[in-house]
């Protein structure tokens, strides 16, 4: 099912890019945009995880670099029946974590330095199990491509605003329609991305609790992580932020923002679901 969603996302990205190209350059713009989208789709499949790691400033570590973390990931991935993922650490004070990669054989589990200081061993195990659940559920490619897609469409729209569109004399999309498309395109991409992220987090919480055997430890971790994210800002692209276990941009979020524009489901709802599992 996730493979179908990945195909739909890539097709949607292609359609958005071609539509923007048509708005900016007519038929020639559409052709160039089609070629560009083909390159973007190939990059998203093969290289999006590297881009996400760079966005967080993360570095891959070995068992010699971080023995306790490496052993924890190894033990939990065996319990989940997964191959050993690459382990990475992001030099961020905010406590957070995420998983990325195109499949279980090419996956990465990344934690921040802040999370290793903020959580107990049981709580950190709960978080690692949550990220391994994303890998087990094959969420990473879908979420990583959604993140990259939203960022790519937003960047293309910014480029279009800087360099301008077509004149009234040219054939094709009217300038007003083109401007509307440039505004709506990134919003649509972000809403799709947010919806995917929220949907997959609940399932990863449940599967992660099953892997670790400690749903309450994950619930406690989520409360600590949300508190930390609100107190400690993190500089990361909004598109990559959806991959994290809690919203790393919570410190910048506007109060009263509607649920459908939130990158993550409400932590209180996630905690309640985990408490129900433990009951």
Swiss-Prot record:
Transmembrane segments: 6-26, 29-49, 145-165, 176-196
UniProt subcellular location: Cell inner membrane
Organism: Gemmatimonas aurantiaca (strain DSM 14586 / JCM 11422 / NBRC 100505 / T-27)
Principal subcellular localisation of the protein: membrane
InterPro entries the UniProt entry points to: HtpX_protease (IPR050083), Pept_M48_protease_HtpX (IPR022919), Peptidase_M48 (IPR001915)
Its membrane topology: Multi-pass membrane protein
Residues engaged in binding Zn(2+): 130, 134, 201
Superkingdom assignment: Bacteria
Name under which the protein is recorded: Protease HtpX homolog
Keywords: Cell inner membrane, Cell membrane, Hydrolase, Membrane, Metal-binding, Metalloprotease, Protease, Transmembrane, Transmembrane helix, Zinc
One example GO MF annotation: metalloendopeptidase activity
Gene Ontology biological-process annotations: proteolysis
Keyword Hydrolase among UniProt keywords: yes
Enzyme kind, highest EC tier: hydrolase
Active site (catalytic residues): 131
Family designation: Belongs to the peptidase M48B family.
Cellular component, GO, one term: plasma membrane
């Amino acid at each position: 099912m996730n493979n179908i969603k990945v195909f739909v996302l890539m097709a949607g990205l292609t359609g958005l890019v071609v539509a923007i190209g048509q708005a900016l350059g007519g038929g020639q713009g559409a052709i160039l945009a089609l070629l560009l989208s083909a390159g973007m789709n190939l990059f998203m499949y093969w290289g999006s995880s590297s881009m996400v790691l760079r966005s967080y400033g993360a570095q891959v570590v070995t068992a010699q670099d971080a023995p306790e973390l490496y052993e924890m990931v190894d033990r939990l991935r065996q319990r989940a029946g997964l191959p050993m993922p690459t382990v990475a650490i992001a030099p961020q004070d905010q406590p957070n974590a995420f998983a990325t990669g195109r499949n279980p054989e090419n996956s990465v589990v990344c934690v921040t330095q802040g999370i290793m200081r903020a959580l107990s061993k049981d709580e950190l195990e709960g978080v690692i199990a949550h990220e391994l659940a994303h890998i087990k559920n094959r969420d990473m490619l879908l979420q990583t491509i959604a993140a990259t897609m939203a960022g790519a469409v937003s960047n293309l729209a910014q480029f279009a605003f800087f360099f301008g569109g077509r004149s009234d004399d040219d054939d094709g999309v009217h300038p007003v329609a083109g401007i509307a498309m440039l505004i709506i395109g990134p919003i649509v991409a972000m809403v799709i991305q947010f919806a995917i992220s929220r949907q997959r987090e609940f399932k990863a919480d449940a599967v992660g609790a099953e892997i670790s055997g400690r749903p309450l430890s994950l619930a406690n971790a989520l409360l600590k992580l949300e508190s930390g994210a609100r107190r400690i800002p993190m500089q990361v692209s909004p598109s990559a932020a959806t991959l994290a276990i809690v919203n790393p941009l919570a410190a910048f979020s506007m109060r009263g923002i509607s649920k459908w524009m939130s990158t993550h489901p409400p932590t209180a709802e996630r905690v309640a679901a985990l408490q129900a599992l433990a009951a």
